[in-house]
Amino acid sequence: VPRGDGRLSHDLDPQRPGPQDACGVFGVWAPGEEVANLTYFGLYALQHRGQEAAGIAVSDGTGVVVYKDLGLVAQVFDEPTLASLRGHVAIGHARYSTTGASTWENAQPTMRSTTSGTTIALAHNGNLVNAAELHRAAGERELMADGATNDTSLVTMLLASRPDLSVEAAALEVLPQLRGAFSFVFMDESTLYAARDPHGVRPLVLGRLERGWVVASETAALDIVGASVVREVEPGELIAIDEDGLRSARFASPEPKGCLFEYVYIARPDATIAGRNVHAARVQIGRQLAREHQVDADLVIPVPESGTPAAIGYAAESGITFGAGLMKNPYVGRTFIQPSQTLRQLGIRLKLNPLRENVRGKRLVVVDDSIVRGNTQRAIVRMLREAGALEVHVRISSPPVAWPCFYGIDFATRAELLANGLDNEGIRRSIGADTLGYVSLSGLIAATEQPKSRLCRACFDGEYPIDLPPDTLIGKHVLEGVGRRVAAESPDLHSAPLVAALSGHDTFSSARAPRPDPEEPTTHRR
């Protein structure tokens, strides 16, 4: 299932994946509608935001069912499964892990039951930077009891640990304690909730159906289910939707710092962020790139697909012909089968192949979205030269990525970032290009039509809008050690009855059933 707007070209190297977003989230409250089907289609539209796992939680008012597994949305769900997920409220999640390993336990939505009998399911796009601090305050054993080691499970537990409060009231207490980037959708038996961190780092939009409401990571997910865009969920806002309508509350003062990299790559080109169409922004970035880095050439080609809009803009501004020079195989890299060493050695040739008749004897401008480690660009330059290109000029539609992201994009470590150790000339020599040009940070910001003060630019300039803890208390696997300690102390932790007792679920919560029984508030996997 290829993503609609292409993968980062760094992912063309199967041994070294490039930046990945944390997740895509979707929620719907719509009595009388097939909410599981709507959620499936919404997740399908958000598949580009996460390909490790997918899940849907649904409720008919009497109980919550969560169905999730590792794999793409279309691999996890089939028609009989969706038909069995009946209700009026649902949330869904497409996962790429930024905290916690890629395991079934860490797939989302996560679920917890309170001692008062309410069940909470939650899905998260983003990354908390104070997860270690929160888990110490909550207690290791309680956090890790269900085998999960991600910050989403931690937040779900915190919400469920206040049985004397309604879910809405508990959220207004818990959300101000969280530091980092988060766009949440969560639910109980009757109500859909959505919340966005005070900086609004990750996107979250509200839509209207004829008979209900939808919340999603991107506007494209609203389009696919026929919902009209109402507005963005505001930074620092909590929304609750039930039979009484929509309620909004502030849990923090807004200090907008939307992710600049969403415009470069993460969001679909048909999405709209802060009123700006992403495709139009990327074309404008390409125009700016041409103004800043002119070159005499015969053909402008994109690295498909994420480099295409910027290449269109570059060609239009420079007057150089736009054309195809690389063909991409969309079916490589979409499987859990590990490639053999022979396939690994083929590397980028598995995914890209030059159009030799188009590039032979030409001076090429190759437009890509970003450079992380440089492996893919190095291979592309070599491949195009072997195909007969006279010159290869690389143009990048973002500034050098020199700093890792701690707010929901799984970049390489700083030591692995090529721009951290080399200047532009060093990078040019490293990848073997005749010339190399990056768009300026000011040029990129101008293309978004957002003021600099409202954007998170940390991966480009190292200015992190949310204070970070010491290195030992942050990172993708910060909670993994806790899980190992708890497992060592409790060798039978993963038996179904014990997991159920510790996590507050009934024994069916841990069942590995082929299909959920909607009569029970349970969590299932395929």
Regions flagged by a language model, labelled:
Residues 144, 164-165, 292-298, 316-323, ...:
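Secondary-structure transition/capping motifs at alpha-helix termini
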Residues 123, 187, 195-196, 207, ...:
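Generic beta-strand/beta-sheet core signal
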Residues 148-149, 153-156, 322-333, 430-448:
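A conserved beta-strand->alpha-helix junction
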Residues 173, 221, 228, 236-237, ...:
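Phosphate/diphosphate-binding loops
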Residues 319-364, 375, 402-412:
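Short, glycine/charge-rich flexible loops or terminal/linker lids adjacent to PRPP-binding catalytic cores
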Residues 35, 98-99, 130, 201-202, ...:
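Flexible loop/turn segments at secondary-structure boundaries
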Residues 175, 190-191, 226-232, 252, ...:
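PRPP-dependent phosphoribosyltransferase catalytic core
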Residues 2-235, 240-297, 303, 391:
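Conserved short alpha-helical segments that host acidic/polar catalytic motifs at enzyme active sites
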